């Protein structure tokens, strides 16, 4: 078949498909603007935004946040909710654990008067509510807290001690098949918080696994593994927060397996000033000599906590350092992009 004949045959097939399934059911990828325009919601931790590679969590996709107890999963999800609201968006929180603290959510920055919350009785109801909210097209981010608390209806109606093999995994698999397409169509971000369990009888390799079967791992565009790695001491040697390490275990939108560290303070959530200090020192924007931190010809303070308080007071300095960090990251990425472009040109010339 000649090239003109192939082109006419393709046009006829496209015309028939659009007649059968509606306009826009098939198109070239370049004309599909949503394919290369990914809108994001900031996480509240600049180090994590940079590790994700796209500046935050993507809208229109599924994100899984998993880790052990008291590692900051709910705090991270609540920061994403607060940032979505600050952008003028609408957020919903499906609290299957019945454990969301409205005072802590407000302290982090969430507008609890506008935050929609649902506390369903069973897993099927929770996932149906999430799907209906996404289908409305009016919600920007939906948090499901947590997968482990999504109890199937038949298990809820049974007796304690009854065995239900694979029931929750089947429920999740069926729900995610419907939810994925709806989220992409309405540009809604769904965040699933998950717990970890130990696999029995594992002698080699990682014995940890997440609840809810394999479907969520497959359908998630991003999986964030969050862990507490230490405590932050304040005055009189009291704990005032936790040091958190995050690993991007899966990423369909940027290179995976990047790591980030940040502070979660008990009285304010994720410390954005702490992220700025860490990144500015790493990029040699702030000069650290002993316990003193200096920026250009100015002494910021002695000790990390003093500098943190200075950045919280001086918003102009905070935003200046943030801008310089972004500029440093973009400058470091430019040579790699130029190298890829030159390799692409060489391949194209060789193909000719």
Swiss-Prot record:
Biological process annotations from GO: DNA recombination; DNA repair; SOS response
Q: Where in the cell is it found?
A: Cytoplasm
Which keywords fit this entry according to its UniProt record?
Answer: ATP-binding, Cytoplasm, DNA damage, DNA recombination, DNA repair, DNA-binding, Nucleotide-binding, SOS response
Instruction: Give the matching InterPro entries.
Output: AAA+_ATPase, DNA_recomb/repair_RecA, DNA_recomb/repair_RecA_CS, P-loop_NTPase, RecA-like_C, RecA-like_N, RecA_ATP-bd, RecA_C_sf
- State whether keyword DNA-binding applies: yes
According to its UniProt entry, the function of this protein is described as: Can catalyze the hydrolysis of ATP in the presence of single-stranded DNA, the ATP-dependent uptake of single-stranded DNA by duplex DNA, and the ATP-dependent hybridization of homologous single-stranded DNAs. It interacts with LexA causing its activation and leading to its autocatalytic cleavage.
Q: Report what the protein is called.
A: Protein RecA
Question: Which organism is the protein's source?
Answer: Chlamydia trachomatis serovar L2 (strain ATCC VR-902B / DSM 19102 / 434/Bu)
